[in-house]
Design a protein with these regions (language model features):
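RNA-contacting regions in translation and RNA-metabolism proteins
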Residues: 1-145
């Protein structure tokens, strides 16, 4: 339901946007655009979805610290997430000097090769500049058998 909506009504909108972009760049438009939709079991465990939620909240003028804490709580409440790290950088709260702030909850073993870590990067466009958002989620270790 987040991207496509109920009964796939958003799929037609996405197809129209793709054809519009292809017309703009004067590319050859195929007769039929095939769109494969995969359902994500737990959307709150996906780093990309969490980063997009944070960007939306910041663009709605929500304070960045509250946004970071809400994103972390949603992720940790989700099934299978053992740790999360959220970093935001830029002119936070419209300050003169840009800075970087981050929060971490749980474990994020970035140096462990078998760690199942999902990473996403997103930008929030605000009147006083862009804010970069990075999200790491740790879902346990991968074991090849």
């Amino acid at each position: 339901g987040l991207l496509i909506g109920r009964k796939g009504e958003g799929a037609d909108k996405i197809k129209a946007q793709i054809t519009g972009i292809m017309k703009k760049i004067k590319a050859e438009i195929p007769k039929e655009i095939k769109l494969t939709v995969e359902e994500i079991q737990y959307p709150e465990s996906s780093a990309m979805i969490l980063a997009q939620m944070a960007a939306e909240n910041l663009e709605k003028r929500m304070p960045f610290r509250r946004t970071m804490k809400q994103i972390m709580e949603k992720a940790m409440a989700s099934n299978g997430v053992k740790g999360i790290k959220v970093a935001m950088s830029g002119r936070l709260d419209g300050s003169e000097m840009g800075r970087k702030e981050w929060l971490r909850k749980g474990r994020i073993p970035l140096q462990t090769l078998r760690a199942d870590i999902d990473f996403a990067r997103e930008k929030a466009h605000l009147p006083y500049g862009d804010i970069g958002i990075k999200v790491w989620t740790y879902k346990g270790d991968k074991f090849d058998k």
